């Protein structure tokens, strides 16, 4: 397989714009005039076939100057030659190579700069960003890429030159290709390593060697001689200095920086006075041309100042007699500058500083050189680093095997690029080749600057031949016919001055790889001559040339080849990713949503999560949802979370939900919560849920919650719960309550309770409640609970509750919870709820309670209760109570009570009882006295009265009336005995 890479070098034209306004009094005519001085932008239209016709300074050539940069290349599409907003510049006519001299008509020599870019695309049509192919006209190539491979704004700069040294603009490009002699079906692509990110970036890439030596000749180096005038650099005023470039400069892709200067000339300036522009040693003003010049500063068709470059690379301008007759002169200068390969040899950051006198500007940029191309064990890169159009010579530097791989039977050939009108002359007479061996690949500079004295000259140890026309061959004979170190090949060649073609060179490296496959890799360097072109950019492009017919054979000049590349790729990827995240979020959301969802999900999940979140959210949501979901979930989660949340929510929701879930949960929860909530809730929910859930959760949470909610809820719930709880309760409560209660309750309860309670409670309660409740409750509860609870609560509540609840719940719950909680709660709730509850609970409770209660209550109770209770109670109670009660009750009770009671009652009863009791009771029951061991209950202890509108029962026979009378007398006797005992106790006190 063969791969080809192209490199392109660009030639930059220099322009200097100078604006000067002069106001003077013309005594002879009595007129005032002022003029703005601008830098001249001289266009060169000279071709290699020079004519001897002399040109005069006519007005037409001057008037065309302001548009020089846009029109000097009429056939091209480049926009790089714009004037960049500089002041208008008068154009001097282009000079041909003649003996005529004129100090005011300077010509322009274009400044080439190396531009390189690498690509691995093979034989593809070029896009505007990759405009390079063997059949592309050089002028079009340059202009298509002038604005796309450089990071800088386009600019134009004129340069000074004597008429006899006028040259054409030059653009240099480079291309590489690689090839191999594998079977046709096994063509291999060339992995190109051209991304700047693949290179190590050093912090400072400037060569510290001093003094700096320029690799070009200086035109009119007059600054080193004593100047006749005065240096007025520090007398210039309104000095402005800027450096324009991107953050990264790619020297091998025609990258450059733009230096801008503006200033005002003092009125005291005279002919011969000078000023200096300092250019940093990291930059040069010539690019790849051998001669560097600066253009004069023009004021219309007059020269304001002439510039030269001194031996240190700085620019010295000398004013002409123009300033003797003018005042208020201003000037603006723009110059492109290129990275100096001798002083910046590696990729890295460089700080550039330039200025006029004490007025300077600095900018740090990343200099990024392109790496060589590599194909299997073959690696090569070439660059044209110098062009001398005066002597028609060029210099090409080629790195052979810069990777230091093992290559068997290595050979290098150089020839013209096929299908191009290359003007290079390659033969023994016009081509001189030097070969240097590099012992350590790290000694190669990335800028392709070569100091021959640093390497061993092995030219006499290699075989150099010219086997074909316009072709040279270099063989690297060694003892074992293989090389493992890099070599540098320097080609000093000539250009045919009579040719109208472009400089286009191909270097091809041959050799066997480790599998003894004969391979080749090519690198193309191309120079395009563009008359009057401001800039030219080049990119690298790989192509696949024809392979040698036999292993070891060196191809002469390859013919045209067409290929249709295609690619078939398939990828199979397996990725394993893990994430650990912590989030801190603050959100304020308002949503209005209505959703109707019907979902059925069956999920089995096990999650272990450790999360810490700090969230502050305020949400205002109005949602109405109708959801019908059936979910069967089996989840086991172990979570340890600490959350601190402050939320204020105002929610108005109406939801109609029908869900059936099967849940079996075992949770072990250790939570410490500090909650401060102010909730105002208004919710209307109609929920019918049948849940069967099986979950095993171990939760340790520490939450600090401050919530403000406004809730209005209307709930209709139908739940079926079966609860089996075991609780052991030790409570210490201090309660002070002041309650004003008005209740109207109609209760029908049938309870079968077997309780043995040992309660020790100390309660001090202070509550102020205003409650208006209307409840219709039908409950059948069978409770078996064994609870062990240790709680310490301090509660201060102020509640105003108006509830109308109708509840029908059937719940079957099996929970095993181990909870240790400490809560500090301050809540202010305003709740209006309408609930319809139907509950059927089966409770078996075994409670051991030790209660020490100190209660002070001020109770004003007006109750009208109609209670029918059937109670079977077995209680053993030790009670000390003092009560002040005003009750009016209508009670129909049938109680079967078995009570073993030891009662020590100290009662100080000062009661003002106004009881209005209208009791019509009819009983067909077998009532057991209160001391009966079974089936005894006290209906007056239940606040579950129910107004009955049924007709009064039949009073029965006379015998039943007599029995009632007897029991009435016995009750009266018992009452007298009771009041007597109380009176005796009072007298004792």
Curated annotation (Swiss-Prot):
Organism: Staphylococcus aureus (strain N315)
Skewed-composition ranges (Basic and acidic residues): 943-952
Ligand binding A region: annotated span: 40-542
UniProt protein name: Clumping factor A
Coiled coil, from the record: none
Residue ranges of the motif LPXTG sorting signal: 952-956
Keyword Magnesium among record annotations: no
Function: Cell surface-associated protein implicated in virulence. Promotes bacterial attachment exclusively to the gamma-chain of human fibrinogen. Induces formation of bacterial clumps, which diminish the ability of group IIA phospholipase A2 to cause bacterial phospholipid hydrolysis and killing. Significantly decreases macrophage phagocytosis possibly thanks to the clumps, clumped bacteria being too large to be phagocytosed. Dominant factor responsible for human platelet aggregation, which may be an important mechanism for initiating infective endocarditis.
Motif YSIRK-G/S signaling motif per record, residues: 9-20
């Amino acid at each position: 397989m063969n791969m080809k890479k192209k490199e392109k070098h660009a030639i930059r034209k220099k322009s200097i714009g100078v604006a000067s306004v002069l106001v003077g009094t013309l005594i002879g005519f009595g007129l005032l005039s002022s003029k703005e001085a601008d830098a001249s932008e001289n266009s060169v239209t000279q071709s290699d076939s020079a004519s001897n016709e002399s040109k005069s300074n006519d007005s037409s050539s001057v008037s065309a100057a302001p548009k020089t940069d846009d029109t000097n290349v009429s056939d091209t599409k480049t926009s790089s030659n714009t004037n960049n907003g500089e002041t208008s510049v008068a154009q001097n006519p282009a000079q041909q190579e003649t003996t005529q001299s004129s100090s005011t008509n300077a010509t322009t020599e274009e400044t080439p700069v190396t531009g390189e870019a690498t690509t691995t695309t093979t034989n593809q049509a070029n896009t505007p960003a990759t405009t390079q192919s063997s059949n592309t006209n050089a002028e079009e190539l340059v202009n298509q890429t002038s604005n796309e491979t450089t990071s800088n704004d386009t600019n134009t700069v004129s340069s000074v030159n004597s008429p006899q040294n006028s040259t054409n603009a030059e653009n240099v490009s480079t291309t590489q290709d690689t090839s191999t002699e594998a079977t046709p079906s096994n063509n291999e692509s060339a992995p190109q390593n051209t991304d700047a990110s693949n290179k190590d970036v050093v912090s400072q890439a400037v060569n510290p060697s001093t003094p700096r030596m320029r690799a070009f000749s200086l035109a009119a180096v007059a600054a080193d001689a004593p100047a006749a005038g005065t240096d007025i650099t520090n007398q210039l005023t309104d000095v402005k200095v800027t450096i324009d470039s991107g953050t990264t400069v790619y020297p091998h892709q025609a990258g450059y920086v733009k230096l801008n200067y503006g200033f005002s000339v003092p009125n005291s300036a005279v002919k011969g006075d000078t000023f200096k522009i300092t250019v940093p040693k990291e930059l040069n003003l010539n690019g790849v041309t051998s001669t560097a010049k600066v253009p004069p500063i023009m004021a219309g068709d007059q020269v304001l100042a002439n510039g030269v470059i001194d031996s240190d690379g700085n620019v010295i301008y000398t004013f002409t007699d123009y300033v003797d007759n003018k005042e208020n002169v201003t000037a603006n200068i723009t110059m492109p500058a290129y990275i100096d390969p001798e002083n910046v040899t590696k990729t890295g950051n460089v700080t550039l500083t330039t200025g006029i006198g004490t007025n300077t500007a600095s900018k740090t940029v990343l200099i990024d050189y392109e790496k060589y191309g590599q194909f299997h064990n073959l690696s090569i890169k070439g660059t044209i680093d110098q062009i001398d159009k005066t002597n028609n010579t060029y210099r090409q530097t080629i790195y052979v095997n810069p990777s230091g791989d093992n290559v068997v039977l290595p050979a290098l050939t150089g020839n013209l690029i096929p299908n191009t009108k290359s003007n290079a002359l390659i033969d023994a007479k016009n081509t001189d080749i030097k070969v240097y061996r590099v012992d350590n690949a790290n000694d190669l500079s990335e800028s392709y600057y070569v100091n021959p004295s640093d390497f061993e000259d092995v030219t006499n140890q290699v075989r150099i031949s010219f086997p074909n026309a316009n072709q040279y061959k270099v063989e690297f004979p060694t003892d074992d016919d293989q090389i493992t170190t890099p070599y540098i090949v320097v080609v000093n060649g000539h250009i045919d001055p009579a040719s109208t073609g472009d400089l286009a060179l191909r270097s091809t490296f041959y050799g066997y790889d480790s599998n003894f496959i004969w391979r080749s890799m090519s690198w193309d360097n191309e120079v395009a001559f563009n008359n009057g072109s401001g800039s030219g950019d080049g990119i690298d492009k790989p192509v696949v040339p024809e392979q040698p017919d036999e292993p070891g054979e060196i191809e002469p000049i390859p013919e045209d080849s067409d290929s249709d590349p295609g690619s078939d790729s398939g990828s199979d990827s397996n990725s394993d990713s893990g994430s650990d995240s912590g989030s801190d979020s603050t959100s304020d959301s308002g949503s209005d949503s209505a959703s109707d969802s019907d979902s059925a999900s069956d999920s089995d999940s096990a999650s272990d999560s450790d999360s810490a979140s700090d969230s502050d959210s305020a949400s205002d949501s109005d949602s109405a949802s109708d959801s019908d979901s059936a979910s069967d979930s089996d989840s086991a989660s172990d979570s340890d979370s600490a959350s601190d949340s402050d939320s204020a929510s105002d929610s108005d929701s109406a939801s109609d939900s029908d869900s059936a879930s099967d849940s079996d949960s075992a949770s072990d929860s250790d939570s410490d919560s500090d909650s401060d909530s102010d909730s105002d809730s208004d919710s209307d929910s109609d929920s019918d849920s049948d849940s069967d859930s099986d979950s095993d959760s171990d939760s340790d949470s520490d939450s600090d919650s401050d919530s403000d909610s406004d809730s209005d809820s209307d709930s209709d719930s139908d739940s079926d719960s079966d609860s089996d709880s075991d609780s052991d309760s030790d409570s210490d409560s201090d309660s002070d309550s002041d309650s004003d209660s008005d209740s109207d309750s109609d209760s029908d309860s049938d309870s079968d309770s077997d309780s043995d309670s040992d309660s020790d409670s100390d309660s001090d309660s202070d509550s102020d409640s205003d409650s208006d409740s209307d409840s219709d409750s039908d409950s059948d509860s069978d409770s078996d609970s064994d609870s062990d609870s240790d709680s310490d609560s301090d509660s201060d509540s102020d509640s105003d509750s108006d509830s109308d609840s109708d509840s029908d719940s059937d719940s079957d719950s099996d929970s095993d919870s181990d909870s240790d909680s400490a809560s500090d709660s301050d809540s202010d709730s305003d709740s209006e709820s309408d609930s319809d509850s139907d509950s059927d609970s089966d409770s078996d409770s075994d409670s051991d309670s030790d209660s020490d209660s100190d209660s002070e209550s001020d109770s004003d109770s007006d109750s009208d209760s109609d209670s029918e209770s059937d109670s079977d109670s077995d209680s053993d109670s030790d009670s000390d109570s003092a009560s002040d009660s005003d009750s009016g009750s209508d009670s129909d009770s049938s109680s079967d009570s078995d009570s073993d009671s030891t009662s020590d009652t100290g009662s100080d009863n000062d009661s003002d009882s106004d009881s209005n009791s209208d009791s019509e009771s009819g009983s067909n029951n077998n009532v057991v006295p209160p001391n009966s061991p079974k089936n005894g209950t006290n209906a007056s202890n239940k606040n579950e009265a129910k107004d009955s509108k049924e007709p009064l029962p039949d009073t029965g026979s006379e015998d039943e009336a007599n029995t009632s009378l007897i029991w009435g007398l016995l009750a009266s006797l018992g009452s007298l005995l009771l009041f007597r005992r109380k009176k005796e106790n009072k007298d004792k006190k």
